[in-house]
UniProtKB/Swiss-Prot annotation:
GO biological process assignments: protoporphyrinogen IX biosynthetic process
Record's keyword terms, sorted: Cytoplasm, Isomerase, Porphyrin biosynthesis, Pyridoxal phosphate
Reactions catalysed according to its record: (S)-4-amino-5-oxopentanoate = 5-aminolevulinate
PROSITE patterns reported in the protein's UniProt record: AA_TRANSFER_CLASS_3 (PS00600)
Protein name, as recorded: Glutamate-1-semialdehyde 2,1-aminomutase
Enzyme class: isomerase
Cofactor(s) this protein cannot do without: pyridoxal 5'-phosphate
Chief location category: cytoplasm
Pathway(s) annotated for this protein in UniProt: Porphyrin-containing compound metabolism; protoporphyrin-IX biosynthesis; 5-aminolevulinate from L-glutamyl-tRNA(Glu): step 2/2
Length: 427
């Protein structure tokens, strides 16, 4: 028995399913989840001392790679001054100033402790601002595990083959309207009929929880136009895409300004954190300025602020995102070439430093239906073959992959060598 197998068996005694987030259980790929004990640069090391090139990156935050010395130093220095105060700090203001300077639409920011808190709070704020109850989301898009958003969601719910979650009252779900991603005509039709009840549209500008599906040409522009027309708040969920697709997030890359945005992952440099913000007029409705309540004991935690500030400053250097995107493109091109040579139907998608891998004969992946039509069984085999070759991918056919600035030519070669053997075995 491997160390991971032993630990997984022990974990299941007191932890439901043996994991603290469902996708980690390897349910969709089979086998025993790997238990990690160390990470450095582009690599993770499991409890059996096996080393893997990491394309999960803690599900997105580790854009600098694991254990960047400057980030670790900033956290160590803050540790000397305390773990948490439950009171304002200078770093919170510094973080708000930096986020507003980097993201085109941000005028005010509120820090929270997770991406789920950020999206939940942004939706509450949109409802308070507009006085309306309904929200529009899109099939396969995941915005955290708050009740009203677990309707036809992506991420772990797709991994488990569950369209929504038990425990969500029908009275909550009835306020959530779900439309096809990348279908602006469906948005136009729905708003023409019920716009007076809709507080907001929330969307991942790049859908990163049904693998990685970029927006179709005109889709984000159409959302902005329709929200302006009907007085609906447009929320970009940039928990995944923020500071990764570009320094200014997906909104900076595509040139579309939402009314509110949510962030997480990179903004905390690997520490638990989230934030939401946007137009000053809307943010002024939140307590203590306005009637919309939101609070959090650990919001603006100084350790998270220290790690996040250092990370954002490091990724702001000229050329950083160009290098990151170039590596991602070269890696995906290499995978496609090897799949084609082996005669394996395979499609990749990319948005900056995030990517999707699909075993599909489609020309492109544009819709939720395209994602669901891909061969999840073949991905399952590919995942384990890549593990055997020393490459750790997301353990689900419905999760995006992530690269870091620590990935270089050596990691690229390991990845492509493993893929060549894997595709040959999949013929």
């Amino acid at each position: 028995m491997s160390r991971s197998e032993d630990l997984f068996a022990k974990a299941q005694k007191h932890i439901p399913g043996g994991v603290n987030s469902p996708v980690r259980a390897f349910k969709s790929v089979g086998g025993t989840p790997l238990f990690f004990k160390h990470a450095e640069g582009a690599y993770v090391v499991d409890e059996d001392d096996k080393r893997y090139v990491d394309y999960v990156g803690s599900w997105g935050p580790m854009i600098l790679g694991h254990g960047h010395p400057d980030v670790l130093d900033s956290v160590r220095k803050q540790l000397e001054h305390g773990l948490s105060y439950g009171a304002p700090t200078a770093m919170e203001t510094d973080m708000a100033d930096l986020v507003c300077s980097l993201v085109p639409s941000m005028e005010m920011v509120r820090m929270v402790s997770s991406g789920t808190e950020a999206t939940m709070s942004a939706i509450r704020l949109a409802r308070g601002y507009t006085g309306r109850d309904a929200i529009i989301k899109f099939e396969g898009c995941y915005h955290g595990h708050s009740d009203s958003l677990l309707v036809k969601a992506g991420s772990g719910l797709l991994t488990q083959g569950v369209p929504s979650s038990a425990g969500v009252p029908a009275d909550f779900a009835k306020h959530t309207l779900t439309l096809p991603f990348n279908d602006i005509a469906a948005v136009e039709k729905t708003l023409a009929e019920v716009s007076q009840t809709v507080a907001c549209i929330i969307v991942e500008p790049v859908a990163g929880n049904m693998n990685c599906v970029p927006p179709a040409p005109g889709f984000l522009e159409g959302l902005r136009e329709q929200c302006d027309k009907h007085g609906v708040v447009l929320i970009f969920d940039e928990v995944m895409t923020g500071f990764r697709v570009s320094l200014g997030g997906a909104q900076g890359h595509y040139g579309i300004k939402p009314d509110l945005s949510t962030f997480g992952k990179i903004v905390g440099g690997g520490m638990p954190v989230g934030c939401f913000g946007g137009k000053r007029e809307i943010m002024g409705c939140i307590a203590p300025l306005g009637p919309v309540y939101q609070a959090g004991t650990l919001s603006g935690n100084p350790l998270a602020m220290a790690a996040g500030l250092t990370t954002l400053k490091l990724i702001s250097r000229p050329g950083f995102h160009a290098e990151l995107t170039d590596y991602t493109s070269r890696m995906l091109d290499g995978l496609q070439q090897r799949a084609d040579a082996a005669g394996v139907p395979f499609v990749t998608t990319q948005a900056g430093a995030m990517f999707g891998l699909y075993f599909s004969g489609a020309d492109d992946i544009v819709t939720f239906e395209d994602v669901m039509a891909s061969d999840a069984e073949r991905f399952k085999r590919f995942f384990h073959l890549m593990l055997d070759g020393g490459v750790y991918l997301a353990p689900s056919a419905f999760e995006a992959g992530f690269t870091s600035i620590a990935h270089g030519d050596k990691e690229l070669q390991i990845t492509l060598d493993a893929a060549e053997k894997a595709f040959a075995a999949l013929k």
